[in-house]
């Protein structure tokens, strides 16, 4: 039995540290090596922003060979015109891409983001891929007994095992393009805070700061790395993830890399002119620094005085010095605590009381404050107000009128189908205000805008827009404003006779504004009713829209099949509740094919023909057979339905929106048609009732 003394004299060796700090012997750059789960170390270097990237050095980094790769599968790339092998790198712990070079008989790492790794393509056998060379040779890539990469070549039927070669990784390719070029990741960064003397002092201070610091998080029980960033002047806290092989910021908010009063161990005090300078040992960066106490902020400020540190002057007393604030007439005692760190006490009613620690203003904190203030001043001085040319009131109005006229002309060219080079036909001569109002009313009737807010009309039955009420409102307002602008422009150009002008209120203009306001409120009510109709439809459908993302070709060939279950359910429900079951296509074998193909790839012509049939049923639900309809009337209905369907299709961005707008249009048309039928039925029932009463009265008289 082994004695206890032997066990204590030979303790178990401690595990190697996860992070090791050092310098690259070739480039003299600070690097940190990370111990990976495969017990191999990989070196990283920092950027000026505080990020860690793989260190590009052939001396520090381990040489990766093909035995570090476990092949998974290979896919063909059209861009590279070669097979791309997906393999797991046991050194970096990542899935990487490689192509085989027949000239050197080795693998070259590539990075093609468009080729994504798919675990479903994993080859289960030993042979992964067979590659044909330019000279007729065949190279077989397979897995060995350990699952690592091995390759064999055959020529004239004889197989031979190829030796293991080094990998040409992306890091080696970068070194080949620009060998030992460290300009991008150098530590020399031009910084400026507006004070050149302080910038030089801060640059010297930065040289003494450690680039990396290894800390232990007591809250998460993790070891993390503090990386210094010159651009921000702060430390970035990173932890290494073994599963992904990457660094990420630590999630603990309690662990910081800032210098606090607990990090300052006082050594001795020395007077310099009228101030007392404390020489301290900073445990955060392991440096000997100088600080003074600021009675205004109740904190310590780092300074650099012409005082040489002398370890022979270190004192062991508790009290260091006393400071007095003239404003509040308080005395502050700066002393060494029982743990040997800085401690502050202030005089109170019951004697001296311990003060709470505050932030320490190191050179880093001072530089950030000065830089922020300098950037604010620079931004305020460089801010230039935009200089606009001085315009008179007449010129401003004229520019507005011309802009309105140009906008109206563009819209008019689109409606007439003219190009920008073609001239617009001249308009009729200007009429009086009464005639202008009549023309406006006629135009509103042509646009099919409802005059009764309780019964919104649908313009689809006459080829209008069934869903663009707001667009009609904007178009009408632009037309009215344009006519007023043109009238003002013509009046400004015509010479007016000299006469005595007396002020009279423009009644016609006031009436126009009043009608415009009434029309706008009426349109708002119509929009509200449209929203209410859509809400009711959604409630009837159970607030479900089950629309397939794509239509198969076999289903699309059936014109009568509904395009969506939700649409078929809603349409059948409306037809069952409000209209009898009809089919106006009995005896009609034609189709409503469109003359031009649409640019919407998500719709097919069969679905569009089916929707035109839905609209025709909504336009004329009383007709049971097409043969009963007049030929011209039937053509007109088809034209209106095609026009309405085309407008809905152009206004839709996807199939769901197309079905929603189509269902809303069918609901509105059916509602309007049913109301007309009810009125006609009531009128027909009233006439025979009145005639029978008269016959009864005449019979009594006789």
UniProtKB/Swiss-Prot annotation:
An example Gene Ontology CC term for this record: nucleus
Q: Summarize the impact of residue 298 to A.
A: Abolishes the interaction with lgg-1 and lgg-2
Q: Does the keyword Nucleus apply?
A: yes
Q: Where is the KIX domain?
A: 597-674
Name the residue ranges with Basic and acidic residues bias.
Answer: 675-685
Q: What is known of its domains?
A: The LIR motifs (LC3-interacting region) are required for its interaction with lgg-1 and lgg-2.
Q: PANTHER family in the record, alphabetically?
A: IG-LIKE DOMAIN-CONTAINING PROTEIN-RELATED (PTHR21504:SF1), IG-LIKE DOMAIN-CONTAINING PROTEIN-RELATED-RELATED (PTHR21504)
Q: What is this protein called?
A: Protein sepa-1
What is the scientific name of the source organism?
A: Caenorhabditis elegans
